[in-house]
Structure formats: structure tokens, C-alpha cells
Amino acid sequence: MGTFRRRRRFLLAALVTFALLHLFSASSIVSADGRWIGQRTGSDLPGGFIRSNKRFGGPGSSPPTCRSKCGKCQPCKPVHVPIQPGLSMPLEYYPEAWRCKCGNKLFMP
């Protein structure tokens, strides 16, 4: 009975330690203003050395390549358009999708 309690206490302590380490390591990577700790701007660097920051895209998908999707119509550019389901009344939320637009016409990418 004593070994079971000791083992359970050890597993609980290990689990709590692991959870705390994970929490503190994840929060130490990002500072309060949302920048990565290792990320520096040009004004932070000595001697006026400017470094370009690699920025990641926001949430959602990336625009498609619209080459040769609009036939002979030019310019063919990607646009975000709302996709409304076939309901009689408009919804507050409906999904958006990428389409290729040329003039007033939309084409599937």
C-alpha cells in the first residue's frame, strides 16, 4: 500500500513539474507586446544596422495564383468573396472563398 501511494505521489509531482515547465517555457518565448523574444527591430540594433523581420501571414488561406484562370481577360486578380448559401434570408456569418476576378466576372481558381 505504501509503494502505491509513493508511486502516485511521484507521478503527480512529475506531472505538475512538467505542466509548469511547459507553461513557463511557452510564455517566455513571447513578450507582453506579442513579439518573439529573439525578434529585434532595426532601432534595437546597434550602429543603425537594419534587419528585415520575417512576418508570417495571418489566419486563413493564401490567395490563389490566377494565371490563365480568366481566359483572355486581363488583369486577372485574386479576391475574397462571401459565399452565401441558398437561403432566402441573409445570415450574420457566411464563409468566404478565394476567386479570380477580371472586370465584373468571377472565375474559379
From Swiss-Prot:
Changes seen on gene knockout: No visible phenotype. Chal and cll2 double mutants are defective in growth, with a short stature, shortened pedicells and compact inflorescence.
GO cellular component annotations of the record: extracellular region
Record's keyword annotation contains Disulfide bond: yes
InterPro entries listed in its UniProt record: EPFL
Main location: secreted
Leader sequence residues: 1-26
Tissue specificity as recorded in UniProt: Expressed at the base of the apical meristem at 3 days after germination. Not detected in the hypocotyl. Expressed in developing stems soon after bolting, in inflorescence stems and in young siliques.
Disulfide bridge map: C66-C100, C70-C76, C73-C102
Keyword entries, A-Z: Developmental protein, Disulfide bond, Secreted, Signal
Compartment(s) where it occurs, according to its Swiss-Prot or TrEMBL record: Secreted
One GO-annotated biological process of the protein: guard cell differentiation
Family per similarity comment: Belongs to the plant cysteine rich small secretory peptide family. Epidermal patterning factor subfamily.
Assembly: Interacts with ERECTA.
Entry function: Acts primarily as positive regulator of inflorescence growth. Endodermal expression is sufficient for proper inflorescence architecture. Redundantly involved with EPFL6 in procambial development regulation. Controls stomatal patterning. Mediates stomatal development inhibition. TMM (AC Q9SSD1) functions to dampen or block CLL2 signaling. Acts as a growth-regulatory ligand for ERECTA family receptors.
Protein name according to UniProt: EPIDERMAL PATTERNING FACTOR-like protein 4
Origin organism lineage: Eukaryota, Viridiplantae, Streptophyta, Embryophyta, Tracheophyta
